[in-house]
Structures are given as C-alpha cells and as structure tokens.
C-alpha cells in the first residue's frame, strides 16, 4: 500500500537525518477519508486537481466538507502531544482530529461538527488533546 511506503520512507529519513519529513497532514487526510468510508479510488479522484494550500476543508464526502487536524509525536524526549492545532476558519462541516504514535499508527480519532466546535472552542486560545476528546470518537486503539 502506498501509504505504508510513504510512512516507511519518512521513518527511514528520520532515522538517518534526525527529523521526519512533514507527511502528517497528507497521511491524516488519507486516513480520515478511509475512516469515514470513502473509497481509495474516490479519494484519489477527488484530490487530483487539489493543492496543498486549499482553504477551509481537505475533502468532501457524502456532501460534507471535512477539515483534518493531526498530531504525531517524534518519540524523542519531550515530544508528548500537549497541544492540538485549532481550525483557522469555519469553512467546513466536520473536523476530524487524529493522534498518531511515533510510527504513524493511529491511536485515536475524534470528530466535531462546525457548530459544536465553534461553541466549544471559539474563545479558547490553546487546545489540548483533552479538548478534542470531548467530540465524537471515531477510533480509539
């Protein structure tokens, strides 16, 4: 599987050069699409004309715009995840946050709809994993 090859290459790079390439975004977008039931071919077809800087959402599935956020600790001392990325806008319908382990293995995934997210987090400057864990659990290892 292509995802596994990408992860293997990134981990080898990290082993050799100390820092992994930034693949967490693309891996988490792919994993989220698979998690909500999108077929790999449909995801591939959707992404063909997209750019890495698309504003608002990462993909559309069953009429819903999905914004994806993720964290992956490097495994080095002090790399524990204590903050999570906050959505910069509300041009989406569903947000999924994924926490990976150091090997890009999904540990948990949580979903928020845009209105619940706004209500819960609009006034909070810095979000932690505990904030996102108040959403709907899509996966927990």
Task: Identify the function of each model-found stretch.
Residues 1-65, 69-141:
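Nucleic-acid endonuclease domains
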